[in-house]
Amino acid sequence: MTAGAAPRILKHQVVRAELDRMLDGMRIGDPFPAEREIAEQFEVARETVRQALRELLIDGRVERRGRTTVVARPKIRQPLGMGSYTEAAKAQGLSAGRILVAWSDLTADEVLAGVLGVDVGAPVLQLERVLTTDGVRVGLETTKLPAQRYPGLRETFDHEASLYAEIRSRGIAFTRTVDTIDTALPDAREAALLGADARTPMFLLNRVSYDQDDVAIEQRRSLYRGDRMTFTAVMHAKNSAIVS
């Protein structure tokens, strides 16, 4: 194709555009037409419809409820910053919940010891929880903490509460985080815990948080459903001139 040639529009993209217009006139929770109905309406193969619906699912415009497809809520906006998931959800008028998967006792290998600033072989607490918003599973969070720094945490911490708030209550201030974000597909276990299709694209956020003395607080791995979450960042120039 030459630079001046018009791009080829695939049939499922035409159907997708029509379905987007249809969705604009529907309300959250409304049932969406079945594949067969859409195929008959637009006189296309059902495989074409499946491709269009797949894109709508990934973009979070529709969601599956059993065998029914319905109009989805808008994606949850998660600001990139030191705030917690709970704080972000509440700021949008949503309820944030957590389901306990497991507490685990680990020992730090060389890599984890370097990240957390502890000795090799030091005890590490691991907390794994499913994140929910208004009852919908949207993320899987795995946090590793130096056990000696948080005595009694497993016995006293309410797993449905914000871990950040609990850590702050112990006099520890979050002053810096180092985040990396990738895309990933869930493995079978992760997909089952999130109630998602194994082909659903995910955001993978790895974070190390530091306190006022620049000592590591935690190492966190968060897997977020790409069809339910989106990330936002606000950037400020250090001076008035921005050179591109």
Swiss-Prot record:
Q: Which residues bind DNA?
A: 35-54
Q: What is the annotated localization of this protein?
A: Cytoplasm
Q: What Gene3D superfamilies does the database record attribute to this sequence? A: Chorismate lyase-like, Winged helix-like DNA-binding domain superfamily/Winged helix DNA-binding domain
Q: Which UniProt keywords apply?
A: Cytoplasm, DNA-binding, Repressor, Transcription, Transcription regulation
**In this protein, which residues make up the domain named HTH gntR-type?**
8-74
In the UniProt record, does the keyword Transcription regulation occur? Answer: yes
Under the heading CDD domains, the entry gives: WHTH_GntR
Cystines in this chain = none
Question: Which Pfam families does the record cross-reference, listed alphabetically?
Answer: GntR, UTRA
Q: What induces it?
A: By phosphate.
Question: Which GO BP annotation is one of this protein's?
Answer: negative regulation of DNA-templated transcription
From the UniProt record, which GO molecular function terms apply?
Answer: DNA binding; DNA-binding transcription factor activity
**Keyword Calcium among UniProt keywords:** no
Primary location recorded for the protein, binned into one broad class: cytoplasm
Q: Which PROSITE patterns match?
A: HTH_GNTR
User: Which superkingdom, per the lineage?
Assistant: Bacteria
What biological function has been recorded for the protein in this entry?
Represses the phnDCE operon, involved in the uptake of phosphate, under conditions of phosphate availability in the cell.
Quote the protein name from its UniProt record. Answer: HTH-type transcriptional repressor PhnF
Question: What species is given as this protein's source?
Answer: Mycolicibacterium smegmatis (strain ATCC 700084 / mc(2)155)
Report which gene this protein is encoded by.
phnF
